[in-house]
Amino acid sequence: MAAGCEGIAPPTLGERTVGEEGEPVKPFTPEKAKEIIMSLQQPAIFCNMVFDWPSRHWTAKHLSKVLEGKQIRFRMGLRGTGTVPQYETECSYVDATLEEFLTWNCDQSSISGPFKDYEHSKFWAYADYKYFVTLFEDKTDVFQEVVWSDFGFPGRNGQESTLWIGSFGAHTPCHLDSYGCNLVFQVQGRKRWHLFPPEDTPFLYPTRIPYEESSVFSKINVVNPDLKCFPQFQKARRHMVTLSPGQVLFVPRHWWHYVESLDPVTVSINSWIELEEDHLARVEEAITRMLVCTLKTAEDPHHPRTWLNPTEVEETSHEVNSCYLNSAVCAFFDHCEKAKAVELQVLSANGAEPRVQEEHMEVEQAQGPSLTSRAEKQEAVSLFGPDLIPVTPASEERGGALEGDSEESVSSNGGHFAELPCARRQQTSKGASALTEPLAPRGPMAHSRVFVSTDDLLDCLVNPQVTRMVAQLLIQGKSCDTF
């Protein structure tokens, strides 16, 4: 049964493990769950891990009582199937209470209140990215109702989490997160996730306009792509899954995702888990910030906010951006120094000789999650089953098709799961070739009509592959001054 406006759908759980005294037992210890998260390189769903969390009862109606009339900001978007993504800069915003949201969403006869200008059949509403520390600043006791420590992160709770409340059709445009990996607990209603692996980045046409620190957007509406404008998207390998109440989705580092609400009301809680790679990623983000702000401000100094995502409230002056970059570089070197000291302590304790210091610091070239031994990766994959369900490719079709809804992968009782593909996708240099493949002019006069905009230039300058190389060169160059 789908979750309606009032209640919460029954969680889709498989057979629970029962202890000697008949009490339910979680399928993974915190240590094992963390090991899986840190080694797994494809999205997966954890089942039977949150059945005792107090926050499993956090329906929108319950939260409206907890928040006691507190106003929150809702992003308002148009329902529709256009081929252009609805970025946050294209949406309007409403400040309202959860009670007012529920009245508009569930009692469409109401024509008063802050949502009165938004016809329910034409618009969706989304209270997204609501950080607990702000939303519950005077009710910090609720932090303890979210227990991420069950996944192997001691002390992690709601304080490091964000809340998402949406109506049917509410969605986030396709993007990747620059930092960390992601754990998402579905509380009420269902959400469909469209995911693409990091190696598909060239096929997703990445852009940093609108600019938001730590988010790389795709130019494509992945649920209705314009394949004439973005033909490479057909090569992207879509993974699709419907997340139901009681399930926790693990999204590995740098996996692209588009998320849409399928039920009248959806509530989700997530937490981004910090990773070793974030130290270099902060340098990349600081480089991106400086380049985007410099060029866009020079292009239109009188309207500096039009290219910024509404979530960006920081000053964008060159002085501030220079401070960001220098802070990120210093933090990277500080982290390396601490890591080196720990390594020396371990070597000393084991009676081993320390390695000879290289002249220049080597920066890891590979993208993707932390390097993990092949044995650990294979062990994580071997744990797939009713309590750890892999998110597999939606179909043999590529990005342009939407066949093979992943509800086949996650059944209503969580007991059935899709088979793993027999062979992993071969990771060749096709991504790089797609990025650099020249496009032939479409006609004899095509050259004279070409116009290169600032955004076109930025799409090249701050492409994730380019900023990674720039960050590596910067770190290697400054390492001469440091070591």
From Swiss-Prot:
It comes from the Eukaryota. Residues 124-288 form the JmjC domain. Residues 1-26, 388-416 are annotated as: Disordered. Transmembrane segments: none annotated. Disulfide bonds: none annotated. Keywords: Cytoplasm. It is found in: Cytoplasm. Pfam families: Cupin_8. InterPro entries: Cupin_8, HSPB1-associated_protein_1, JmjC_dom. SUPFAM superfamilies: Clavaminate synthase-like. The keyword Cytoplasm applies. Its main location: cytoplasm. GO terms for cellular component: cytoplasm. SMART domains: JmjC. Residues 88-208 are annotated as: Interaction with HSPB1. Interacts with CRYAB and HSPB1. May play a role in cellular stress response. This is HSPB1-associated protein 1. It comes from Mus musculus.
